[in-house]
Amino acid sequence: MEICDFYLEDLKTKFRKINPEEYYLSYSGGKDSHLLYWFIKEYAKIDGIKIVGINTYMEHPEIRERIEKYSDIVLMPTMKPFEIKEKYGIPCFSKIQDDFIDRYQRGSRCKSVLERIKSRQFVGRDGKIHNSSFSLNKKARELLLSGKLHKISPKCCKYLKKEPAKKYEKESGLKAILGVRGSEGAMRRSQYTSCFTKDKKFTPLWDLTDEIENAIYEKYNIELPKVYEHIERTGCMGCPYGHYKHDTEKELALLNEAQRHFVCSYFKESYEVLNIKGE
């Protein structure tokens, strides 16, 4: 048995742990969630699982089309992008770093925030000195500490995606099946170590590697948007969090003029700090 088939059969075993009528697939239209869609509908033919997507206004056109095509229900965000920008700010460096910047800009001067902003080391709860993963470049630190840095926050994901899903779960009583993988980064590797989260969300792909996923896509000729020929992961169009891999610039090049203008207007201040060439 090929490794991809072994994984799919093991995935069947994982799905036997849940009652399908108590869960819904959180469908983003991306590579991982579409693999789950294909598995549920085509491979295992599991009935009773609703497919629920969210129109965040920020998806790549191909991804948005998939959401509309394959979802039973399409949710809308609790706030629109520019409403979030006005009230909270926009992403810039990384989710972890932006969270500390957000707290500092909202007035927090607690020790943990100041240590992470002003130095690369901090004293942990264990009393030992740790190297901080939070590090701003000189320009950004000077702008932040002088009060000249634009309003920064990672909250767009909360209001565009998490809040609509949370509301749907409360109203429907259903729990989410998430297409998240531990191999997608250090943070997710520590967050997802089994099929279930603490709040009973089902994460059956937590142990799926890129190699096996690609093998499944190739063997079964599963539909893959052309955007994946240019970038490894899709999220919100032009999100600055992809700048360290230069994915942000690649994404902008794929957009039409109107889409690029919208994205560049939304992330304008962050692009200027990061020297991302938009329009």
Kindly give the residue locations of the regions a language model identified.
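ATP-dependent adenylation/nucleotidyltransferase module used to activate substrates
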Residues: 1-219
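ATP/NTP-dependent adenylation/nucleotidyl-transfer catalytic domains that generate, transfer
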Residues: 20-21, 25, 196-198, 210-279
